[in-house]
Amino acid sequence: MSLHAQLSPEAIERLHKQRRNSTISSIVIAFLSITLVALVLGVFLLPSLVKEVPTIVTYESNLDNDNELVEKKVQVSTNRKPSSPSSSMSKVIVSNTSSPTSVPVPEVDVTNPSLDFGDGDDFGSGWGDGDGTGGGFGNIPATMKKRCSKEDRLARLQETGGTPECEEAVVKALRWLKKTQKSDGSWGGSNQAAMTGFALLAYLGHCETPHSEEFGDTVTRAILYLINVGLKNDGRIATSAPASNHWVYEHGIGTYALAEAYTFCSKLNINFPDLDKVTIQAGDMIIQGQGESGGWVYCFASTNSGDNSVGFWQIQALKACYHTGLWTDSKLKKSGRKALEWLEKAQGANGAIGYRGNSGQSPGLTGGGVLCFQMWDAGRSRNARSGVKYLSKNSDFNWGEENANLYYHYYNAQALINHGGVDWEVYNAKFRDELLKNQAGDGSWNQSGVKHGPVNNHMATCLATLMLEVYYRFLPGTGAGTK
């Protein structure tokens, strides 16, 4: 026998409703649980799937605070991975405070420019006619970026009369300079701004920038040293006393190097605090120091004459300033035209250009005058052609003799490769191998005892290096593309 309780219809209905509510609650709880699990997984997995975008921080210098210039000192630290100077960028940290700010630069590809060379009619067609485009070295002016890949350098060497040995000698020299750099970034026991400027130009001539694996730290410290010299002296890039004759040489050479460094750094998005400020101050000092004649003399004194040994460095510096974009073109071109007016007066009937107005005094400076004409759009002028004719007859190069003075041939090599043709081929055959075989085993050159020549091994090494870079360096101020 069994007993069964009979439920009322109302109780049965309540039971069914309770079951329905329980089912709905179970579904809702399950959905919420799945959603919660998905959110937790997303928190942990999402960061690994999203590429982090670096925050770029740059330094904004205070141009109005003049009272701190003497005490202000720029500091730098770098962190770079192995790379070639022409193929990839590394991270550079630049700051003037105790907390460095980072300027990351992406890796870029470098395009190879044209390899056409001169036809003997002043300028070769391969000297570029405008700024590059794109990132990295593509932004470098066309007349400068051809030095920025090893493949292009070797191709230019072959096209213009160089050899692979020239490239090897340059690298050996740059390594010697790296070893001899002082802890403060300078070189030399005296006239350090000039000696540092020479070295920096040699590095930049090989496209060694703060990004370079082997020489990046060396270049960075050299730039910072020159910036600090300028900050301490209101834009005067010199360690010599203002009353000395030497400081104007230092200033021209140092300004030339800083301006070219600024062009590279600005195009590569490398920010050195106060580099622009010091470059502008230094360039303005050259413009203001130009005499009524168009020339420059010791101490930038007022003059109706000109000291061409001093003036040539100012003219080269102003052309480098032109490429920075920090001035209006008209201001710099006006100064350049005035300088050429003086050189026209100083040039002799035979094409020679000497120390001052007397073309017969130190006519070895003729190459510098020709280079200045070429820099400021007068490479096809009668004056430039006359100077080239003089050089073609008076540019022997016998190491150990006075005619091999590297100070003069630094100019001759640039002037004659710009001109191109047979004149360049003949001259190149005179100096190239002589220079190569007289490099010391440590990478340096010594030309002591040569009258009016390099004052020390450092200067001789820098000038010789710049001569061997002439095949691909293409100074910012040379070539048809600099107009």
Task: Please give the residue ranges for each predicted region.
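Strand-loop microenvironment adjacent to phosphate/nucleotide-handling motifs in alpha/beta enzyme folds
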Residues: 1-2, 27
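Intrinsic-disorder/low-complexity signature in envelope-associated proteins
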Residues: 2, 6, 10-12, 45-161, ...
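Membrane interfacial helix-start segments of signal peptides and signal-anchor transmembrane helices
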Residues: 16-39
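Membrane-water interface at transmembrane helix exits
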Residues: 42-46, 322
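An alpha-helical repeat/solenoid feature that recognizes helix-turn-helix modules
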Residues: 131-172, 186-218, 231-284, 288-433, ...
